[in-house]
Amino acid sequence: MKKKTTVVVSVLAVILIAVAGAIVFKSHQDNTAQNNNQKEETKMKKLPTITLKYGDEVIGKLDGYTMAMDESLMRDVIVPISTSHKVPMAIKTQGNRIKTVKYEVKEYNNNSLVDNGTIEDWKENGGTIDLTYQASAIMEQGKEYFLKFIIETASDHEVYYYTRATILNGDKIVPNQIKFAKKFSENTFNEEKSSDVAAYLEPNSKYASDSLGQATIRSTLGMVIWKTFRPKKISDVVVSAKDIYIKDTGESGTYTLNYQIEATNAQKVKEKYNVAETVTVWTFKGKNYILAYNREVNQIWDCNENNVGNSFIDLGIQKQTTTVYKESSNQQYIAYEINGDVYVMDIIGKNIKSPYKLKAKSSETLYKTKAKVVNVDDKGNLTFIIYGYSTSGYHRGKNGISVMDYNWEKNTTTEIAFIPSDEPSQILTNEMKDLCYKGDGTV
């Protein structure tokens, strides 16, 4: 049931290193191979972040962009707005001095302007600004709108925050649905509540899987309740509202619960995992039902003797069931990506290095920023790309594709190009085959 993702080293490579005893790979995770631009991170302030609320309930967090994005593709969060048309917000300044906070509302279908203005009457207290966005009275119930906030800092930089919004026809729908989703999640950790969980599942052998990396409403009860895994939550649950629909047949809301868990493996070593649990709740005549359920689990992978062996790399429990890796033509080096972190291994020299570490602390980070290995040569030199929302200090707030070169001997990583894009990572992933190719030794 606790199926893991494993990369198997090629047969020829195994023959080349077939020596007595276990192979120990040296880890170079604290090397100088991090992106040279990361040196700038200590010099540059982080961008302000916005936390959105529905009453006292947090329903989403927005990261800022210093470039314009395609609004139609920015669907990470939707803001449910109460009948009072008020949206409580909190801005974490991250050391920036905020001059103004503006908003802009557009029609979802034709992008025409509905409302814009400036949010007044706020004060900063200890690096946090509490304020309220008042939605326009002309916004219709159940209709979806583009909503953008613009923060101007003292350095005259404008930072953009993209989301969507919809006016609700009742004030208790969202809090009750979130409470219901959280309760369902809690029940999956309690075997005594398994009958409560089973009541909402639709098991189908056609979709059966023995991997804990992903569980859905069609999975077996044992998979959903973590049967033999027995993890425990080690972080708060962070809720993000994804979709809201209001119809005559009821109201549906989709919410993602992000949190971390910890479990002990067969070697008695504690391992941590990022979890994204998405629940679609349908409310009809005051009663809640589950329309869809999806749970993704990704182990926070560490390069150690438990995960790297004689002829394999054990990537642990991951949503992805197979891992694409690149191998040098002399079959001495292999390179791969796991959860935004990039690794390259010298099979003969029994050495493994990390050219880039995303250090994702949540599934939201994994969703917005991704990595892809392009090529590794016979000397262990690597070309890879980082795409989506940039966490680099040099490109902070930008979105696009960074083309990176890694030098094995010098153990250094250098950015050779940055290509801005107004499309988020999930769209770029689908286009990556066209955007990334290998020709005469260059990207």
Where are these regions (language model features)?
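Aromatic sugar-binding surface patches on proteins
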Residues: W122-Q134, T365-K368
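N-terminal Sec-pathway targeting helices
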Residues: M1-L16, I23-F25
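Beta-propeller fold detector
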Residues: D115-T118, A292-Y293, K353-K361, T412-S421
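Core segments of small alpha/beta cavity-forming domains
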Residues: E40-K102, N109-S112, L147-E152, E158-R230, ...
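Surface-exposed, charged secondary-structure patches
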Residues: S72-P88, T100-E107, S112-I119, T132-F149, ...
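Sec-dependent signal peptide cleavage junction
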Residues: A20-K43
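Exposed beta-sheet edge and beta->alpha loop/turn motif
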Residues: S252-I290, N294
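Short, solvent-exposed aromatic-acidic interface loops
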Residues: I167, L291-D302, P420-E423
